[in-house]
Every structure is written in structure tokens, then in C-alpha cells.
Amino acid sequence: MKATLLLLLLFAVILPGTISAEQEKPGSCPNVDMPIPPLGLCKTTCSKDSDCSETKKCCKNGCGFMTCTTARP
């Protein structure tokens, strides 16, 4: 019984980290912390990288919202 409980606890700790690591795509978001940031679509279109197509990442834009953007290497 204790072994089963310990195993379930171990999966509860490890599994969420594994899932979130799979959702993040390589590359980095463009820098919007500039004196005049590039403006983007002023609405949120994503909440995580997996919401975006192919190589795009979910990044902040110049309006303060999250949108799918081409990732920088």
C-alpha cells in the first residue's frame, strides 16, 4: 500500500513537468521591451506554444497581449 501511494505521489510530481516541457517550442520570443515596441494584434490568440502552428511560439506583443509569433533562433 505504501509503495503504491509513493509511486502515485512520484508520478504526480514528475508528470506535470514532463508535459509542460513538451509544449514549449525551441527558440525565443522577440524583444518587446524597447522604447517603442513593435505593435502586434491587440488581443490574445494563444496561452501556450502548443496553441500555435508549427514553429511559432506564444509570445507577448507590443500591446501587452499574447500572440503566435515566429521564434528567434
UniProtKB/Swiss-Prot annotation:
GO terms, biological process: defense response to bacterium; transforming growth factor beta receptor signaling pathway; venom-mediated disruption of cell wall in another organism
Signal sequence bounds: 1-21
Record localization: Secreted
Every WAP domain range: 22-72
Protein's UniProt keywords contain Signal: yes
InterPro entries the record matches: Elafin-like_sf, WAP_dom
Reported tissue expression: Expressed by the venom gland.
GO cellular component: extracellular region; extracellular space
Any one GO molecular-function label of the UniProt entry: transforming growth factor beta binding
Disulfide bonds: 29-59, 42-63, 46-58, 52-68
PANTHER family: ACP24A4-RELATED (PTHR45938), WAP, KAZAL, IMMUNOGLOBULIN, KUNITZ AND NTR DOMAIN-CONTAINING PROTEIN 2-LIKE (PTHR45938:SF11)
Function: Damages membranes of susceptible bacteria. Has no hemolytic activity. Not toxic to mice. Does not inhibit the proteinases elastase and cathepsin G.
Protein name: Waprin-Phi2
Organism for this UniProt entry: Philodryas olfersii
